[in-house]
Amino acid sequence: IDLTGLPPTADDVRAFVADPTDSRAKRAKLVDKLIGSKEYVEYWTNKWADLLQVNRKFLAVEGAAAFRAWIRKEVEANTPYDEFARKVLTAKGSTKDNPAAAYFKILRTPVDTMENTT
């Protein structure tokens, strides 16, 4: 559930339990499969969009869509969390050219940014 936001199917559980492979190797294989899934990308895109407060209130429809699309691209690319955070927190310029800069349109004051970031 943590990786895709969805419970495993009954068939997936049966296959996992029936697999005679070492438990650790079996889990690692499953994690790799889930991280490569479209469900993982969708879940974490939504999770990050929620955490970064992507909405139309400050960004309008196009800005929110562009920021969400940027987040999706980063999740699909499996960008490490520290790099993702750095891209958001150091984003500058036009939100059209650099959608990550939209974060600072949402959180307009340094206090708001600090409270949401820490």
Where are these regions (language model features)?
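Short, structured secondary-structure elements
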Residues: 1-118
